[in-house]
Amino acid sequence: MIKNGHTNEALSFTQKLTESIAVEMSAINTNHPVVNAVLNQKYRSMQEKHIAVILKVGDLQEICLEEEDIVILLSNLLDNAIRESEKVLKNTGKAVIHLKLECEDHKLIFAIRNPVTEKVEIENNTIKSKRGDHHGIGLLYVKAVVDKYGGDMVLSCDENEFKAVVIL
C-alpha cells in the first residue's frame, strides 16, 4: 500500500491491526492492571495447551492487596490447575478449568476448580505429599498471603476435581 502511495489506507490498516492485537492480548479485564496481566498470561497459556476455561470475573479495581501478593495468589493456584489439567488432557482429551474472581460484600472471592488424574490427599487444609516431590509447596505461599490478610482458604478434592477457594 505504501509503495503504491496509499499511505492513508496503510495507516488505517495498521491501526485496525494494532487494535485487534490489543484486544487479543487483553481478553480479560478486571480493571486491575496486575490481575489483568496475570489472568491474561495464564489464559493465553491455557489456550495454547487447549485447556478450556470458564471464567466469572468482576471489577477488581478496589482490591487492596500488594501486587506481589496478587501474583503469588493467582500464579500458584492457576499454575497448579494448568499443570494438572495438562495431565488430564493427555488421558481424556478434555480438561476444563473453572475460575471465579470477584468482590462480594467487600471481600475478594477467588475460587478455582480443575480436573485431576487422581484424588489428592488434603490434611489440615494442605496437600499431603506421598512422593516427597514438593507437591503443594506453592499452596504454602498462597496460605501465607491468605494469613497476611486475615482471610480463609479451603481446599478439597475428590477423584475427579480439585477445588480451592480463597476469601480475603
Which positions does each model-derived feature cover?
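Short beta-to-alpha transition helix within the HATPase_c
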Residues: 15-19, 31-48
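Conserved short strand/loop->alpha-helix "switch" segment adjacent to the catalytic nucleotide/phosphoryl-transfer site
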Residues: 27, 53-74, 130
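Conserved ATP-binding N-box helix of the HATPase_c
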Residues: 67-91
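Short beta-strand/loop element within the Bergerat-fold HATPase_c
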Residues: 90-106
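Glycine-rich/acidic phosphate-handling loop/turn and adjacent ATP-lid/helix
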Residues: 106-136
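Glycine-rich ATP-binding loops of the HATPase_c
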Residues: 150-160
